[in-house]
Amino acid sequence: MDISMYLGCSLGAALGGVIFASYKLGLLYQLFHKTERQSPRHGGESVAEVLRSHGVKFVFTLVGGHISPILVACEKLGIRIVDTRHEATAVFAADAVARLSGTVGVAAVTAGPGLTNTVTAVKNAQMAESPLLLIGGAAATLLQGRGALQDIDQMSLFKPLCKFCASVRTVREIVPTVRKALAIAQSGTPGPVFIEFPIDTLYPYHVVEKEFAPKNTPKGLMGKIIAWYLKNHLSNLFAGAWESRDLSPLPVHIPHATDDQVQRCVELVSRAKKPVILLGSQATLPPTPADDIRKALESLGIPCFLGGMSRGLLGKNSPLHIRQNRRDALKDADLVLLAGTVCDFRLSYGRVLNRRSKIIAVNRDKSQLLKNSDMFWKPTVAIQGDAGSFLLNLSKALKGHRCPEEWPQSLKEGDNVKEKANRAKADEKTERHLNPLSVLHRVDELLAEDSIIVADGGDFVGSAAYIMRPRGPLCWLDPGAFGTLGVGGGFALGAKLCRPESEVWIVYGDGSLGYTVAEFDTFTRHKTPVIALVGNDACWSQISREQVPMLGSNVACGLAFTDYHVVADGYGGKGYLIGREDESQLEDIIKKAQKECKEGKAVLLNVLIGKTNFREGSISV
């Protein structure tokens, strides 16, 4: 290599280094975009503007200094700020809003422990496929990794839990980052997204400038370099911050079945004599209205088993809704349509499916679509697409065709026999206190037609799932496949805000109540009255039922018959203690609770219950 070539390469490398450094330091951007040093505006306003343009009505939070600008700006734009007593509750409330409103639920929490407190709730949203945006505060951009207050590697925590994670580095990035996150949350298989906002991207220039002002910097050349670097960093942070940007929602991508796939399924369904449909929560996702799905199912005339958020889709007493004997029905079925239903533990990993049956599986998520298909079952047709729109297209293509009526009738007859047997168990006297099945039947009979039921617990809630009947679509909220305890307070809060005229019930076990009983304070402060039905048997019964006979000890399963109703009173609600001596007045107490709830009081019914064998053999691991 001659000297001229060597010099040319060296100059090229040097020039490339200068250009790269200029880009990283924002020098090139600053040449063309102004830094408005006198502007009182702050990054929280940009966040609020994007949220408003996307139809966000609520932001759930537990306040912290890192995120205060976002909360203040949202309030000024008419977005309601709802503060809870635990960060997990804020995320659960956002999850409920996402499920019931068809939009993205939003929670904002402070840095460090504020964010770590949300991990379980975010994982629950991921597994329940709920589109929500988690906003987290963070240490200032220059202080991350340097031991700042509440500074941890938050991105590593949330990358496994979220579809999209971003850390905003300049104020100008806020709008495009939030727009992108909201679109990703709703696209494909919905799920949570996370954006980290360093504190210096949220406060006004003059506030951040004070923090960046050089203090005790070295003298001489090094001091000048540090001062220049800090000044440039600040300028780049705010360069182009307040330029006009598009705030509108980005397109949302939803996968759909192809015409050929629908046609193949039409042929299979038209030949079936004993088809069944298993609907999961995915069947209720936007954009297909739940009422349209109901009409499609009624047109098909195929018996349906409803799970998760699809409970209530067919109303209270549909002849097509089969609630009992699912295993037997699947054994006899010659065609099974899994509409958003997954072959996990809830279907014994696919082992309950008849190998001779034709199986149509529809799911937005490929991994869920084919889960355990390598071992226990094989789909005849597997469609990675939206279950709701698929059912509509299938119904239209099969117009005029209905399932043979004797098949759903026979399943309904078996259903009625099992329901009668279950009712007989409710009439049995327990050794002490009230029969929980009887209590649940009484409540179910008195539920308002617009009621929303929130399920949070193990044994008592498991019984409620058999007995209590949601009156309509999107009227049942449970955690989903993760089986998380502690969703009750947040789910009920979100549900009541979405549907303020509806009667919202939380069905609690006495164990699960302990997670969110403090949210009675939230219900009172934010005027979101709900009714909590607590099955109090002083035990973690879901675990105790198997632990005692298998291992011979009730260790860690025992609780006390605690006065939870007094706690509700202390938080500004109204509590009732209900024991066996109150059995004859139970209906009157329930009606009184409903009346007080309508008048604005959150109510807790602390019902002392005894033991039954109704759920022997139920899954706890």
Curated annotation (Swiss-Prot):
Record: residues binding Mg(2+): 510, 536
Q: Which domain of life is it from?
A: Eukaryota
Question: Its catalytic activity?
Answer: 2-hydroxyoctadecanoyl-CoA = heptadecanal + formyl-CoA; (2R)-hydroxyhexadecanoyl-CoA = pentadecanal + formyl-CoA
Cross-referenced Gene3D superfamilies: 3.40.50.970, TPP-binding domain (3.40.50.1220)
Record's subcellular location: Endoplasmic reticulum membrane
Which topology term describes how it sits in the membrane?
Answer: Single-pass membrane protein
Name the UniProt key words of this record, in alphabetical order: Endoplasmic reticulum, Fatty acid metabolism, Lipid metabolism, Lyase, Magnesium, Membrane, Metal-binding, Thiamine pyrophosphate, Transmembrane, Transmembrane helix
Write out the GO MF terms: acetolactate synthase activity; flavin adenine dinucleotide binding; lyase activity; magnesium ion binding; thiamine pyrophosphate binding
A GO CC annotation recorded here is: acetolactate synthase complex
Q: Please list the GO biological process terms of this entry.
A: embryonic cranial skeleton morphogenesis; fatty acid alpha-oxidation; isoleucine biosynthetic process; L-valine biosynthetic process
Q: Give residues annotated as binding thiamine diphosphate.
A: 87
Cofactor: bound how, per the entry note?
Binds 1 Mg(2+) ion per subunit.
Keyword RNA-binding annotated: no
What is this protein for, i.e. what is its function?
Endoplasmic reticulum 2-OH acyl-CoA lyase involved in the cleavage (C1 removal) reaction in the fatty acid alpha-oxydation in a thiamine pyrophosphate (TPP)-dependent manner.
Q: What is the name of this protein?
A: 2-hydroxyacyl-CoA lyase 2
Natural source organism: Danio rerio
Per the UniProt record, the lineage of the source organism begins with:
Eukaryota, Metazoa, Chordata, Craniata, Vertebrata
